Regions:
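Histidine-acidic metal/acid-base catalytic patches
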Residues: 26-48, 52-135
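Active-site acidic/histidine proton-transfer and metal-coordination neighborhood
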Residues: 1-45
């Protein structure tokens, strides 16, 4: 089991639920939480990818609320894997939920470089400021 070995070294492990088109193993936050409950260690957390969550969750904010302190990292992406703001996801409740569960970790952009990498990066920065730092 990697969990206890990593814990000895102070290294967290992240489990990312993926959408049903990529795997049939762990698709939702609830699936991930069920697996975490079976582990002997507490240093395994969920990597919550907002793109995958848009496909699988009834409510992205609700799933994040359910995960609570088990959120170890967030992939900040819109419904179409483009920069936040270039899809249809409503990020205000997601940002509010992350704040309400006390998440203070990183949000990384795992996005497509569309319409080009410079504009995708600029949109990501703008959206991060709008929803996370200024929220």
């Amino acid at each position: 089991d990697l969990g206890p070995r990593a814990q000895v070294h102070g290294v967290p492990l992240l489990l990312e639920p993926l959408n049903r088109y990529e795997t049939n193993l762990i698709n939702t936050v609830a699936d991930g939480l069920a697996l975490l409950e079976t582990l002997q260690t507490k240093n395994v957390k969920l990597l919550c990818d907002l793109f995958h969550m848009n496909i699988e969750e009834v409510s992205v904010a609700g799933a994040l609320r359910e995960a609570g302190g088990n959120v170890g990292h967030v992939h900040f992406a819109d419904s179409n894997r483009r920069a936040v703001g270039f899809g249809h996801t409503d990020f205000a409740p997601i940002a509010a939920t992350l704040a309400s569960i006390g998440y203070s970790g990183y949000l990384s952009a795992e996005i497509l470089p569309l319409p080009d990498s410079e504009r995708a990066a600029a949109q990501t920065i703008s959206s991060y400021r709008k929803f996370v730092t200024e929220g």
